[in-house]
Amino acid sequence: MREPDLCFVGRVIKAGTAEGEALVSSEPIGFLGGVDGETGVVTERGHPLEGRCVAGKVLVFPTGKGSTVGSYVLYQLAAAGRAPAAIVNAESEPIVAVGAIIAEIPMVDRVPIEALETGDLLQLEG
């Protein structure tokens, strides 16, 4: 893959390295009821990513929302081989942070996500 065009320093939530295509949402994501835990497809009606699959992508969104069970949906995605390669948030919150930790998904926050677009090549090192 080619080298990324931009470089940001964020706060590491779950250490690790990852590389992949960005899948960017301007809206928060709620994993319980918003993402199918077996397929990785965003199912929340009206969400900007509705119908898109998070598997293998660097998932970029402002913050999480919804039930604490959302952490386990991230774990379910990992167990099914359908997890995102990494997560980038503007500001993390406990639901997504715990999910990333238990699912071993590299995660950072405090990144200016408005500078990122779906399809960008992203590399995380943390």
Segments predicted by a language model, with ranges:
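Feature captures the catalytic cores and cofactor-binding loops of soluble hydro-lyases/lyases
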Residues: 3-18, 23-126
